[in-house]
């Protein structure tokens, strides 16, 4: 167990970069596919499906095929991992001449072991290459060029973003694999999203790579470029507010160690990897218990499963904007390189992300993940005792946590996703929303100009600019193993109770707890905020010395849920947001809450559908699904860029330990450098 390094000193700064391509051969069953393995996948598949003028074959997803859990745990629990690890395989989703093909490839035999055609609804996530190709196609399309000229605009100043179009009752045959291109105008700004060119419909068929529909419906006045700049080098005084420079350093070095993809810090050990769809994946998170002198299981696997982003404008230019970001675009594929000292503090360790491009060639996102210790001035625990005569006692421990971070930029929004581990045993998942609003042009510059009864579907945030109302629903898949694989879900209701007449008390009421163990999936669906209850995953086979079942409690954040009608097409596809919390029995194929094929899906392969089987979940290997929700009514402070809006939740040990696990954490040793005394004004 790595000790906590609490000595703090301001000295110098450093960052460490660990390249994923160096992890060859993999030493862990959950290690992401290496560059060498991705090249092997490409070689083997290209031999089976030769690409030519009449045979179009593209890689849409390549990732680690989920290994058998029992084999993983046997390997993990063996002394020094001496048992042979599970077979290492790749899972590939490809487009093959207009069909979606699912391929499993085994690395030891260097052979394809499974190959089938997907016959259901929906399409795989878009590749970067085909999105770029679609934009290059449109700028050469004469009807589009003519429409641009009609508006008096310069084609060279136009940029595009691509949008999936969802599903609105079309049959499978009608629901072609198409995207809609949304044009924006630069001409004096780089903040493209604040200058939309509306009134045009541009649809591109991705399989045929041609413009399948083009309409120029109307000419809409664009917002001006003035006031949209956000680059500090281009902004003019006055600046502010002024923040003083600071560097936090540990003279003993970081308190965590990264060995391949294994991270060890304080009393935690976990595996971290990168997936092109999920982003960060945390696996086999275990907590060292000094009372029993061993690591205890907490989280088998946790990651982002899906994001649902519906906008609240039913007009032709907006109704289709109901993204399923991870399934449509890939939350890992859209992840960006993190900036040392700003995205991540000094002392951070950075890791690259490797994934397969459309032709199967490995691509790399440098510094896509970072790991760092967080000193935020929080207090781990404290107490001042002044009630004892002639004695005053004060004990304080500053809090430190370990954060694994990724930032995924899906179009205009930047999502900061944090997995934060605390010495107390808690795991906090945080989501920060920042970036640029998606806006629409209007004729108004003041609210007094809005016609009586007119709904502008948002807020006037600048001249001729409305920030459109929308939601963000961020769903996490949390495969918990609380001290083992046999877990249950307990809904511990807090009930107001009348004081019994037999008790001599002036109190009329109090609250007490009424725990109920969910036996099936239906009993575990939770809409937060309807009643007071604690939600706990327990291991009924493990109890403390006082008889309490060991467990982890969900400390939820916002109770925001969907406001769309249940029969609205976007909500049918995103029915996994109907409840804030779901519990399902572990099924290796149930990974993506919005379905394996999200693009143009019809809602028939989602968490909501799987859960209709109402399977047994008591004393089973179970998975918790939790959705962080935001209703976003834009404000002027969100323009031209948006200050980070944060949400999240916490998994907190509940009777997991016999006592406070950080009781014996020693006070920090603080070393100060020069000029650390505040200046009095």
From Swiss-Prot:
It catalyses: a primary methyl amine + O2 + H2O = an aldehyde + H2O2 + NH4(+). The active site is at 325 (proton acceptor), 413 (schiff-base intermediate with substrate). It is found in: Peroxisome. Mostly expressed in stems, and, at lower levels, in flowers and leaves. Mainly detectable in stipules, hypocotyls and roots. It comes from the Eukaryota. Disulfide bonds join 344-370. GO terms for cellular component: peroxisome. GO terms for molecular function: aliphatic amine oxidase activity; copper ion binding; primary methylamine oxidase activity; quinone binding. Cu cation binds at residues 470, 472, 632. Its EC number is 1.4.3.21. The modification 2',4',5'-topaquinone is found at residue 413. Pfam families: Cu_amine_oxid, Cu_amine_oxidN2, Cu_amine_oxidN3. Pathway: Amine and polyamine degradation; putrescine degradation. Mn(2+) binds at residues 481, 621-622. Keywords: Copper, Disulfide bond, Manganese, Metal-binding, Oxidoreductase, Peroxisome, TPQ. Substrate binds at residues 323-334, 410-415. Induction: Induced transiently by auxin (IAA). Induced by jasmonic acid (MeJA). Accumulates during dehydration recovery and treatment with putrescine (Put). Repressed by abscisic acid (ABA) and salicylic acid (SA). Triggered by wounding. Topaquinone (TPQ) is generated by copper-dependent autoxidation of a specific tyrosyl residue. One of its GO terms (biological process) is response to salicylic acid. Belongs to the copper/topaquinone oxidase family. Copper amine oxidase that can use putrescine and spermidine as substrates. Involved in putrescine catabolism in peroxisomes. This is Amine oxidase [copper-containing] alpha 3, peroxisomal. It comes from Arabidopsis thaliana (Mouse-ear cress).
